[in-house]
Swiss-Prot record:
SUPFAM superfamilies in UniProt: Thioredoxin-like (SSF52833)
Family of the protein in this entry: Belongs to the glutaredoxin family. YDR286C subfamily.
Organism: Dictyostelium discoideum
Pfam family, one: Glrx-like
Name of this protein: Glutaredoxin-like protein YDR286C homolog
Length: 108
């Protein structure tokens, strides 16, 4: 039953705001990508990496220029500046459980 639910629900998008030359951003990448790709079920989370320095991302530059790296799911910030790896795992597990519960309830 759980496998069927996991195979049928949509991906959860993590927006990862970053910029070139940011050492904290590089450290965050070394934590978040393995967490999502190796430690959670395949394709349950996707990472949308957003370079705030690009011309078309000016609204993010204005908002996060002094705060990168920033990770968000929906409107919730799950990390800013430095990643607490334990908190990241806790947040991702909590969000995944909530999504599974929601999808299961919608199917019933």
């Amino acid at each position: 039953m759980l496998t069927k639910i996991l195979n049928n629900f949509k991906s959860i998008n993590i927006r990862f705001f970053t910029r070139p030359g940011c050492s904290l951003c590089q450290s965050a990448k070394e934590i978040i990508y393995p967490a999502v790709e190796e430690d959670f079920p395949t394709n349950r989370f996707t990472i949308e990496e957003i370079d705030i320095d690009k011309e078309n991302n000016k609204q993010y530059f204005d908002k996060f220029k002094n705060d990168v790296p920033v990770g968000m799911i929906d409107q919730k910030i799950i990390f800013k500046h430095r990643i607490d790896e334990d908190k990241l795992y806790y947040d991702l597990e909590t969000i995944l459980r909530q999504q599974i519960k929601k999808e299961k309830e919608e199917k019933e």
